[in-house]
Amino acid sequence: QFIYETGDAAGQNMTTTCTWQACKWIMKAVRRFEGLRIKNFLIESNLSNDKKVTYQTFLKGRGIRVMAECLLTAESCEKILKVTPKLLVTAYQSFVMGSISAGMIGININVANIIGSMFTALGQDIACVHESSLAQLHIELTEDNCAYCTITLPSLVIGTVGGGTNLPQQRECLEMLGCAGPNNAHKLAEVIAGFCLALDISTLSAIAADHFARAHEKLGRNRPVNYLKMGDLDNNFFNLACHSLHPDA
C-alpha cells in the first residue's frame, strides 16, 4: 500500500502518477530475479477506496481526518434549538439504533448537505462528496445537564491549491474563509467540520421537536411564500430580532 503526504493539495492525480512510476520501477527491478515475473499489473483495483465509503476509509482515513466539538448548555438548547439537552440526546440515540439496524458505516444526520454545497463553492472534487461525507456523530448528556456534541470526519478529501481551487469564483469563496493557497488545508477542514456539526445538531433538534416535517411542509419549494422581503429589513425588524435574543439589553 502506498501512503502519501500531499501538502495542501487533494493530490489524487499526483498520487496516481507517483504510484504508477513506482510500480514501473518495481516491474523493471524484478526482472533480474530469475524465475520471478509479474504476470499482470493494474494501477487501480479499488484497494485505494477512491470515492467509495468503506470500513478501511472509516478506520484509516483518506485525505484529512478532522474533529469538531461543542458544549451546549440547557439554556442554549431550549432558547435556540427549542429542545432540552435530554431530548436531543434521546433523539440521537434513536438515530444510533436506526443506523445500526440499517448497516450504516458511521452515524450522522445530513453531513452530505454541507459537503456537497461547500465542495461546489470551494472548488473541490464533487466526485469525492460520497467518501468525504463519511462521519461519526456523538452526543451525550453531561452531569451538569449540558449536551456534549462531537463529530469526526475521517476521510475529508480536500485541497486549497490546485484543481478547481484556481477557478475565479471558487478562489474568491476560499479567500472569504481565509483558506486560499498553501498552509490552509487543515484550516479549511476545521471550517467544514464545524458547519457539519452545526447542521447535524440543528436538523436533529428540528426532528426531536417535531419541527422538521412541519417546516418542510410550510416552507417547501412547492409552496413558495414571500414571508420576508428586502423592504422588511428596516430598523424595526432588527430591533425586534435583537430584543427577542437579548430581552434584557
Locations of regions flagged by a protein language model:
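Glycine-rich anion/phosphate-binding loop at the beta-strand->alpha-helix junction
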Residues: 4-166
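Internal helix-turn-beta structural module
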Residues: 148-248
